[in-house]
Amino acid sequence: IELFDFEHLNKSNSRFDLDKCKWLNGQYINDLTEQEYIEKAAPFSNNASEKIISLTQPRVQQLSEIEKILKPILDNEYPTDHDASLKISQTPEIGVMIKELNQSFESLDPWTAENIKITIKNYADDKKIKIGSLMLPLRVCSTGVGQGTDLMPTLEAIGRNATTTRIRSRINQICTDI
C-alpha cells in the first residue's frame, strides 16, 4: 500500500477489448506443451488423431475454433473456397503444374512432410519458379481453403491417397480447361 500512487492511474474508464482477450488466450494456448494442448483440444476435435490436432495449435486463439480449422483437413468432400479457387484459376499453366506435381506425389515414398517439401522444391527448381507460387494452389486443391495449418505436415496427416485424390478432383473443378 505504501507504494501505491494516484498520480500514475489512468483517468479514463476501463474498457473490455474482446480482440485483445482472444489474442491473450491464443498466447496461453501456444505456451501449452503439445500434450497439454491435445488434452484440452480433444473435445473440440471430432476424434481427430493427436498428430492432426497438434497442427492446429499455432492457429488457435480459442479452443472452439479447432473444429472449423480441422474441417477442411478431415472432410474429403469439403467444398472449395470460391475466392481461393478464383485466384489460382487466373494462372493458366497452374493446372498443368499441379497435375504434374500430383503425379510425383503418387509415387512418393515415404509420405512425410520433409519428402513432400523436397518434392515441391525440386519441381519448382526444375520449372524455374518460386516454391511459393505452388503453395496456394496445393493448399486449395488438397484442403479446399486458401489458408490453414502448416501445409506439408497437413498433407502428411491427410495421407498420400486422400491428398492425391483431392488434388486430382479439385484441380479439374478449378481449371476446367485442362
Role assignments for model-derived ranges:
Residues I1-S45:
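A conserved active-site cap/scaffold subdomain adjacent to cofactor or substrate pockets
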Residues L18-K22, E50, S54, G132-L136, ...:
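Non-catalytic, well-ordered alpha-helical scaffold segments
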Residues E34-I129:
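Small-residue-rich helix-loop
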Residues E114-I178:
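Charged substrate- and nucleic-acid-binding regions of tRNA-handling and nucleotidyl-transfer enzymes
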